[in-house]
């Protein structure tokens, strides 16, 4: 390797010893008889100090020729001293320029000179050199790692379902069509039907982390056309509340994992991530509509709670319940997909829920209808043709246990967890209504 240590690995035990560091030139300072380089790597900053009388002359002459963002390797002796900004410095014995950076730069990776979001996204490779931006993606990595840890500890089996499909998952029109040889196909908007089919196999508890594609023309700060979904499904449940319990445990596990393992990144972001109030409050759809009515927002029964309503409800729950996260459940059947089970004694209401995070829906789930004949009827009620779902329905004809699950939007979880205003900030190369490159 060209480096022996990251910046964060240089400790007092290395004082007086030789190391090799590598990274990008963040700053060069020339004070005549002494020159400085600050090198940035993934873990932080290293100060290189070059006194004219202590370093080879070729190094001393090379330093002023360095540009910001040149990639260099420095080999030298570690010197811990209170005179150094970071508490230590490296006295160089060798300096190699690996790659020169063009000037001017498309944006300032230190963030001192602000850039518009579009400029940043057009130059994402350089945007991530900003420690704040990099911290977001280190935390994103932790979210996915913690998610997998949680599911394995809970006895779940990871699956991978097709992303090229022949049938709309929920019968909607928000699909990206594509040509699949001589057939018409679509990009998958959800693994819903496939994870339900897995409940007929005996795997019992499955999860998937993968991309979903939705051809929604929304151009908002919380919508993406390609996003990552965390999906789970489990068999032999008695009610949707067991699924809500599972989702609550997952969210708490992920947040606490980030709090424990990403202290440095949270500090860079200047953000204090608190453990949510638990248990998460649970309010029915009817109760949510009553609260909104008291706040002057009327929503006809049976309709989805719109963005304004979600925001009002989020503010109310925070101020009155101290809750950032809360469930809304027992939705009108007409507002939810065909595969959600209805209440026997009140079929106009179904066993569905949403999880809201400060006024933004981050997850939907519920108990599924596992009885074949009723499921077929519910497909018809939505104006869909059961023949289009034959591959899915077959799994319900040969022994299907009661089951339920959820889909959790990874980007929405991360943006709300870190209180980031635009969902495009938490995905590397966002795909939205207007952005297809890079």
From Swiss-Prot:
Molecular function in Gene Ontology: aspartate-tRNA ligase activity; ATP binding; magnesium ion binding; RNA binding
Annotated positions binding Mg(2+) 2: 361, 364
GO BP term, example: aspartyl-tRNA aminoacylation
Enzyme Commission designation: 6.1.1.12
Cofactor(s) essential for the protein: Mg(2+)
Positions of the UniProt region annotated as Aspartate: 192-195
Family per record: Belongs to the class-II aminoacyl-tRNA synthetase family. Type 2 subfamily.
Organism: Pyrococcus abyssi (strain GE5 / Orsay)
EC main group: ligase
Binding site for L-aspartate: 170, 214, 364, 368
Protein name (record): Aspartate--tRNA(Asp) ligase
Keyword tags: Aminoacyl-tRNA synthetase, ATP-binding, Cytoplasm, Ligase, Magnesium, Metal-binding, Nucleotide-binding, Protein biosynthesis
Gene Ontology CC terms, in alphabetical order: aminoacyl-tRNA synthetase multienzyme complex; cytosol
């Amino acid at each position: 390797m060209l480096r022996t240590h990251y910046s964060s690995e240089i400790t007092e035990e290395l004082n007086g010893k030789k190391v090799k560091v590598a990274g990008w030139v963040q700053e060069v300072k020339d004070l005549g008889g002494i020159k400085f380089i600050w090198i940035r790597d993934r873990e932080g900053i290293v100060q290189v100090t070059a006194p004219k009388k202590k370093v080879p002359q070729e190094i001393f002459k090379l330093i002023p020729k360095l540009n910001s963002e040149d990639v260099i390797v420095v080999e030298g002796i570690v010197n811990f001293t209170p005179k150094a900004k970071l508490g230590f410095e490296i006295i160089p014995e060798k300096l190699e320029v690996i790659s020169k950076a063009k000037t001017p730069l498309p944006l300032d990776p230190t963030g001192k000179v602000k850039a518009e979001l579009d400029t940043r996204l057009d130059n994402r490779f350089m945007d991530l050199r900003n420690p704040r931006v990099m911290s977001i993606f280190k935390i994103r990595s932790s979210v996915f790692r913690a998610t997998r840890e949680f599911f394995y500890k809970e006895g779940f089996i990871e699956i991978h379902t097709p992303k090229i499909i022949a049938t709309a998952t929920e019968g909607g029109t928000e699909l990206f069509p594509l040509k699949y040889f001589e057939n018409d196909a679509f990009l998958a908007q959800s693994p819903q039907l496939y994870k339900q089919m897995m409940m007929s196999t005996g795997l019992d508890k499955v999860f998937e982390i993968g991309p979903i594609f939705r051809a929604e023309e929304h151009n908002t700060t919380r919508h993406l056309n390609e996003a990552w979904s965390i999906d789970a499904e489990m068999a032999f449940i008695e009610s949707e509340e067991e699924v809500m319990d599972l989702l609550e445990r997952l969210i708490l596990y992920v947040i606490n994992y980030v709090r424990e393992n990403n202290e440095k990144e949270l500090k860079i972001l200047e953000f204090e991530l608190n453990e949510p109030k638990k248990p998460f409050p649970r309010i029915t759809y009817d109760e949510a509509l009553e609260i909104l009515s008291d706040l002057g927002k009327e929503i006809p029964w049976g309709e989805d709670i719109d963005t304004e309503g979600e925001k009002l409800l989020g503010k109310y729950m925070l101020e009155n319940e101290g809750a950032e996260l809360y469930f809304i459940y027992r939705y009108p059947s007409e507002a939810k997909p065909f595969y959600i089970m209805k209440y026997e004694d009140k079929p106009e209401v179904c066993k569905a829920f949403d999880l809201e995070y400060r006024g933004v829906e981050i997850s939907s789930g519920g108990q599924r209808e596992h009885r074949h004949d009723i499921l077929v009827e519910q497909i018809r009620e939505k104006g869909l043709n059961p023949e289009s779902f034959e591959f899915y329905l077959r799994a319900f004809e040969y022994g299907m246990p009661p089951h339920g699950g959820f889909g959790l939007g990874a980007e929405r979880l991360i943006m709300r967890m870190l209180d980031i205003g635009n969902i495009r900030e938490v995905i590397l190369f966002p795909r939205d209504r207007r952005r297809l490159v890079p």
